[in-house]
Amino acid sequence: MEQVSENVIVYYPGDPIGDEASGTVKIALVGSSSYDPSGVHDWERKFIEGVKYYADRSMNSKTGLVMFKNLNYSILCGKAANPMQNPQMDPNNPEFITKMSSNLDFCDAADGIIFNFLKKSQSPTPLMLFGHLVKTGKMICKCPQEYFSYPLVKLMCERYQVPLYPGKMVSVLLMLQGLFTLPAFQQVQQFNLPE
């Protein structure tokens, strides 16, 4: 667990979700991951930094965005803080079991799931996890059209009414706003207009 700001806590595979997460908006980050040392494709870290920026800024009444005001976030990051020493998909590989179990646990506990496919990913694991989560009603998806299974992802998103964001012009702010279309986030915000 890592406290990245007053309003944002990050959990990684193997971290138990403790009492400090109660009363927070829980966002699971799952999908393709990259351990490229340059960090160019580290979308999870970029998302965490973006949430930190908007959460911290929302504390300021002059510059904050109303929809993020007074919210605390728990980011349930499916990417291990360090690359797995043994990334083999094997039921006897404890690192693989911990990562996959954490991904499933994080998604179960989350109010919203951001599922991201990296353009060059060829791993079958994110696609399998996507198929498992697509019907949850609490997911939004980012998938570039160049992804090898984009037609399947698009079809599943349309069928189960999952918001799909293609392309590289998708920002953290746009993804956060997309989460607020989900029922759990609408309940958290309780934006009820008087009748």
Language-model-derived ranges and their functions:
Residues 1-195:
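Conserved catalytic or regulatory cores that recognize and/or transform ribose-phosphate-containing ligands
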